[in-house]
A protein has these predicted regions:
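N-terminal regions of ATP-driven nucleic-acid and macromolecular assemblies
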Residues: 1-212
């Protein structure tokens, strides 16, 4: 991932594949700088703590900000402003911003700030923005197919890359943990049902006892 430059990620609204793509890099950066934070601006979902932790990211290092859209303001203007302030903060090592309606001028400001501050900056936008011009040196388009994340590089420094890159949607460690959690929940449900049946049977026997 380019440090000091914007990486623009284009993806369908229902993909929710951001973490699968950038999680490993974010874990590496935060692991080396335990006092630093990553700022998530206007994420469309709530951070799933086990997902983060099993990606190697401490939840305390993630700061989620949802700026309110003020009446009369240009769409995403407040989210852009928060992203700018985060890029300027020396306690922040990475900014992840969801800016579906950001204008080109705002994106240019973010790209310039990322370069000045030597920060990691990921900007997530809808795939419909692919036809728009962008100051990002790196632009990727994502698609989710079954358990695979397909990544197409549509802009980068150097020669173009025609082939599609395929990545696992979830890392194996996280898949194992989610399956284990599901098994534990299923077992707990079975144990609870067995206990309930036992209690019902006990009450039935008590009601059938004949007083001496």
């Amino acid at each position: 991932w380019p440090v000091g430059a914007m990486a623009e990620i284009l993806l369908p609204a229902t993909a929710h594949a951001e973490w699968s793509l950038v999680g490993a890099a974010l874990a590496l950066v935060l692991g080396k700088q335990s006092h630093q934070r990553a700022v998530l601006v206007s994420p469309p979902w709530q951070v799933f703590t086990p997902f983060a932790e099993y990606s190697g990211i401490a939840a305390r290092q993630l700061c989620c900000i949802h700026p309110a859209q003020k009446p009369g303001r240009v769409a995403d203007a407040d989210s852009v402003w928060v992203s700018e302030q985060a890029l300027k903060c020396r306690d922040v090592c990475a900014v992840l911003a969801w800016l579906p309606h950001a204008q080109s001028q705002a994106l240019r400001r973010l790209q310039l700030l990322a370069a000045q501050q030597r920060q990691l900056l990921w900007v997530f936008r809808p795939e419909q923005a692919r036809g728009q011009s962008s100051p990002a040196p790196l632009r990727l388009c994502l698609k989710v197919l079954d358990k695979t994340l397909q990544v197409r590089v549509i802009k980068r420094r150097g020669p173009p890359l025609e082939r599609v890159i395929e990545l696992p949607l979830l890392n194996q460690r996280l898949q194992d943990e989610l399956l284990a959690q599901a098994d534990r929940k299923a077992q707990s449900r079975q144990d609870a049902e067995a206990l309930l049946e036992s209690l019902k049977a006990g009450r039935l026997l008590s009601s059938m006892e004949v007083p001496s």
